[in-house]
Amino acid sequence: DDVQLDNVARTVLCNNVADCHISLHWDGDGLGYDKGCFYISVPDGLKSMEPVASHWQEHDALGASLVEGLRTEGLTIYQNGSMNIDLTQTSYSTIPSVDMELGNASSDHSDSTLNSLADGLVLGLNAYFGN
């Protein structure tokens, strides 16, 4: 049976069994146009607090690598590719962790676009892990 885990439970689970934690989302911003892909980066005000201080650079490096993979696939990137938001996931994660926004309700959700998103994320993961 499927079980819904909250953000803290998902983060704790990933900290213990995963090499990284990537949460995929389509932004619920209500816009009538596709604003593109981006990752949620750690706000400056949290970067000196533990455990964030020991891991935020890994989170941002993973996010930047994923965005670059998506850019390579020709996907739209929102502004500079990141947005600072305080998230439980990155605040308590001890492994590279990122929330990826892959567009919004107005984005193209065709099989072709979903395949391009998947290919871009794989490119970014391979680059991050040096494969």
Residue spans for each PLM region:
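Active-site-proximal helix/loop segments of hydrolytic enzymes
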Residues: 1-131
